[in-house]
Amino acid sequence: RDRSPSRGLGDVYKRQIKGIALKLKGKGNHIITSEIEHPAVKETLHFLETLDFKVTYLPVYENGIVKVEDVKDAITPETILITIMHGNNEIGTLQPIAEIGKLARERKILFHTDAVQTFGKVKVDVEELNVDLLSLSSHKVHGPKGVGALYIKKGVRITPLIHGGGQERGIRSGTENVPGIVGFGKACEIANNNLEENYARLVKTRDEIIEKVLDAVPKSYLNGDRNERLPNVINFRFSSIEGESLILLLDAKGYQASTCLLYTSPSPRDGLLS
């Protein structure tokens, strides 16, 4: 297995997705993804579209999950890459990555998954998930910010985006951030050691919150599948109250809440709309 440190989340996505696309352009120009991917993934794909790559954006359904059958139907002779996130950062749904990965292997198509949200929260095993490439970010497991990692299956080659001294086996040249890498490694160790205990605790709390909110609040709805979801992410919508009023009420009770992600506008995000 090859592992490579990175400079952060956006850098990881660009290196893997752009690197694979440019490497395989002679074999095909079609990429399959979903409508609920992280903006850094979607913007990378939009850039590739300016280079004459074709991208299919698969929908999700009411449960927030991509159908494997839709992936299968989207494959063409020109398909070189499938990239579907493992867990969604907005609504928390988990995608059928192992099944999609199996399909990709059968069709000899490279498969990338964004495991940034799931790593440290649920078991992430590249062999069980059938992935060729996988993205991670340090800050999601309480490690140093601005540090990421990518898994590249042995034998898979990508085109480097930064040239120079040939560090990281030529995948990314430039002086390596040793303190960041060490800190990320320690954060991974701690997260892995406490994984089962934290998972059980979070699932119990998550399910209690879901049950109590749906029972107590009129016209409240859970977004995404009830069971196939991250242990630490819940997304509700309320038809009986205006969002900002709810935020003020929760703040008065000592709860931190928001109607949007930190780096977005108050408008609904693609994942929720999908």
Question: Over which residues does each language-model region extend?
Answer:
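Conserved PLP-anchoring active-site segment centered on the Schiff-base-forming lysine
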Residues: 19-42, 54-59
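Conserved PLP-dependent catalytic core of the aminotransferase class-I/II
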Residues: 193-246, 252
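Active-site phosphate-binding strand-loop segment of PLP-dependent enzymes
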Residues: 56, 60-120
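Single conserved hydrophobic/aromatic residue that forms the stacking wall/gate
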Residues: 1-9, 13, 263-274
